[in-house]
């Protein structure tokens, strides 16, 4: 399965349409499933329910439009999950969700089973095996790793020796692992190409997330009162919201969420998506994890914070120019709702007028057709009359001749 944000798809459509063609080819195989995620790959699930719903539904529409199928399985940005988030996802009609098999949540349980959300039993949960996933995405080319070099047959053997009853092994990783975190010179692609054949030899099969949540039953509910993710040793959200800088930027961004949500300005909406991207906050982290962190164009978390706040300040000015700060949000919402309702009413009236116009045109056309038929019929009658008169005249003349003959006799 692949999960690609709406913002990423937009960029691919503009700058790398060949990649979109490849994605369509994958889709045509019927062996690749496209998942749903937040449109911006952001953190709205931690901040604002309305924003989260809006961008998830927008992403679902985008995926259906591009690939012809409505996603049934959801994965949040960086696999962020909690009981509350699971309930929201289930309420939008999703059947399954991917998340992290974090030790502090699972305890003695294994991630190799299907679980379900404790707020919505209909939402099945697929948990990442972080060891097997990170063996590929983080450790594959590390020559200091005890298992280096890793070959496909060895990797499949690790899976094969797991208990027979553990039927689901979920390997989730960032696509950047293939070529960036693990350079192509490490033969990472050759490793992946060899996996299916090695798996087949051991009787191990591959499935899409939807196939798993459809075929397998949940063994238990999963209790996650606080958000978890697949990032860092803590498997929490501290990588994005762990310091004062990050929380300041995050809170300021979502302070205008309601006004942006009410806006129909295309550029405002687009920049809102860009500003929500989770990496904006990840670049500001001051955590020392021992793992190399790509900070993008920034040399330090402070550079990232300064630049982001400058851009965010400009964005908020643009939002306030549309919807002034001195207008209460509830009052603004009420006014915009009234305008929208009037607009909807006008649209309905226009549809009604168009309907009556079409009906009137149809009736006029029918009357013209009927009038034409009557005219044609009259012409036919008129043309037949001379023949009738001739016949009558002939009969009268013959009668007169007969009478004349009778008189002579």
Q: Over which residues does each language-model region extend?
A:
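Acidic, His- and aromatic-enriched active-site or binding-groove loops in soluble protein domains
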Residues: 19-36, 69, 90-111, 115-127
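Catalytic domains of cell-wall/extracellular-matrix polysaccharide-remodeling enzymes
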Residues: 57-112, 178-192
């Amino acid at each position: 399965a692949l999960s690609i944000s709406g913002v990423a798809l937009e960029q691919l459509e503009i700058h790398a349409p060949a990649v979109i063609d490849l994605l369509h080819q994958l889709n045509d195989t019927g062996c690749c499933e496209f998942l749903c995620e937040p449109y911006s790959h952001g953190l709205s699930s931690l901040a604002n329910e309305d924003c989260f719903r809006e961008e998830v539904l927008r992403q679902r529409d985008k995926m259906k439009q591009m690939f012809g199928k409505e996603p049934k399985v959801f994965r949040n940005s960086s696999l962020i999950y909690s009981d509350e988030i699971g309930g929201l996802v289930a309420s939008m009609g999703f059947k399954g969700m991917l998340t992290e098999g974090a030790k502090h949540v699972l305890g003695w349980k294994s991630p190799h089973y299907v679980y379900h959300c404790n707020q919505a039993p209909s939402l099945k949960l697929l948990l990442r095996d972080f060891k097997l996933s990170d063996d590929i995405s983080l450790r594959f080319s590390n020559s200091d790793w005890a298992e280096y070099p890793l070959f496909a047959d060895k990797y499949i053997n690790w899976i094969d020796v797991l208990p027979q009853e553990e039927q689901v092994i979920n390997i989730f990783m960032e696509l950047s692992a293939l070529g960036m975190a693990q350079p192509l010179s490490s033969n990472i692609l050759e490793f992946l190409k060899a996996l299916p054949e090695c798996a087949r030899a051991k009787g191990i099969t591959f499935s899409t997330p939807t196939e798993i949540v459809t075929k397998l039953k949940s063994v238990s509910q999963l209790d996650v009162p606080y958000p978890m993710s697949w990032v860092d040793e803590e498997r929490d959200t501290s990588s994005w919201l762990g310091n004062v800088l990050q929380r300041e930027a995050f809170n300021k961004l979502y302070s205008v969420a309601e006004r942006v949500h009410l806006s129909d300005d295309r550029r405002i909406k687009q920049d809102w998506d860009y500003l929500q991207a989770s990496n904006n906050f990840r670049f500001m982290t001051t955590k020392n994890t021992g793992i190399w962190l790509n900070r993008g164009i920034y040399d330090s978390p402070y550079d990232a914070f300064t630049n982001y706040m400058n851009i965010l300040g400009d964005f908020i000015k643009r939002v306030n120019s549309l919807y002034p700060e001195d207008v209460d949000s509830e009052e603004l919402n009420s006014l915009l709702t009234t305008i929208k309702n009037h607009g909807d009413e006008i649209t309905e009236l226009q549809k009604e007028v168009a309907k009556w116009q079409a009906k009137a045109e149809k009736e006029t056309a029918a009357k013209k057709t009927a009038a034409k038929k009557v005219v044609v019929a009259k012409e036919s009658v008129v043309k037949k009359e001379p023949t009738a008169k001739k016949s009558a005249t002939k009969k009268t003349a013959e009668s007169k001749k007969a009478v004349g003959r009778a008189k002579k006799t």
